[in-house]
Amino acid sequence: MVATTVATPFSNLLFSSEKIEVEKKYTINFFTKPLDKYGYDFMIDTLKMGGVDGLDLTVRPKGSVLPEKVAEDLPLVAEMAKKNDLFLEMMVSNITGAETPHAKNVLKTAAQNGIKHYRMGYFRYNDYEKAKETIANAKTQIQSLMGINAQYGIQGGYQNHTGNYFGAPLWDLMVVLEKVASPWISSQFDIYHAYSEGYRSWQVSMEMMAPKIGSLAVKDFTWEINNGQAKIKKVPLGQGIVDLDGFFKNIKNLNIVAPITLHIEYPLLEKHEENLSLIEKQKIMVAKIQNDVQFILSKLHQYQLI
C-alpha cells in the first residue's frame, strides 16, 4: 500500500466514489504539441478561448518545456495557467525509466506544480531482439518508475500507439501493467490508435484495459487509398471513422473515470493560412479547438457522463 501521506492518482485507479463526486470527472486537456512553437502567452490565451479545461503540456525534447529547463519554465507555465483558470494536471514526457536524463527532476518539479499524470515515452519492437525481449525490457524500465512516481505522487501513463510500438496491440501493455500492479503506472488509452490497430476488436481491448486506464486520449481519422496503399488522414472529431460513440458508451458502461487529453493532429492552419497575422491565425485555431471541445462535451452529455 502507498503511504497515506502521499497524494493519490487522480484517475479511477485509486479514487473513492466520494472523491470522484467532488472532483470534475472528465476534464478536457489539450495536448499542446500543435502550439509548442508559439510563446506561452499565445498558447495559454488560445486554449482559454478554445474552451478546454486544461493543458496536457509537452515536457520533453523539442517540447513546450525542455527537460533541462523544467525548474525554470514549468512553474512559469503553471502560474500562467492558474491565472487564466486552466488546469495544468497533465504532461507528455519522454521518460521511459528512472535513468532517462532529467527524469527525477522533471517528475519532482511537475508534482510540485500540480501535475498529477504524465504520459511516458515509448518502447519499440525491432529487428535485433525478439518481441518477448522487448516486452521484458519495457516491464523492467516501467517498474523502475514505480517508486519515483509514488514518492512524488504522480502517475505515469503509457499510450498505445499504432505501428511497431510496444503497446500498439494493447495485450502486451496489459500483460506488463498486470505484472507491475501499481496504481502509479497506468494506461493512457488512445481510441484513435486502438481503433486503427483493432478495427473490430478494440472494444475487447478497452474492456480488458479498463481497470488500468489513467487517462483517455481522443482524436479521429479516416483512410485514404493512394495507388492501392492505405494511409491515415487525421480529421476533426466526428468527421472520421473512429467509433467515438462506442468509445464514450464504453466509458460509461465500464465506469472509467479519467481525464481526457484532446489531440488535434490535423492541421490547425492550412498552408495558405500560414502567412496570416498572428491574430487571424489564432481565430482559426480557436474555432477548430472549440469545435472538438464541443464534440467531446456533446458525447459526455449524451452518455450521461456529466
What are these regions (language model features)?
Residues V65-V70, G97-T109, Y122-T134, N227-V235, ...:
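Surface-exposed, active-site-proximal loop segments in enzymatic domains
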Residues F31-L35, T58-K62, S93-T96, F123-Y125, ...:
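Active-site beta-loop-alpha junctions enriched in small/polar residues
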Residues D56-A78, E129-K130:
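Glycine-rich, proline-tolerant flexible connector loops at the mouths of alpha/beta enzymes
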Residues Y26-Y38, M91-T100, Y128-I135:
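Active-site mouth loops of central-metabolism enzymes
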Residues A3-S11, I44, T96-S186, V286:
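Active-site acidic/histidine proton-transfer and metal-coordination neighborhood
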Residues T4-T5, S17-T27, T32, Y38-K48, ...:
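Histidine-acidic metal/acid-base catalytic patches
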Residues I20-E23, I44-M49, E68-L88, H102-I115, ...:
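Acidic (Asp/Glu)-rich catalytic clusters
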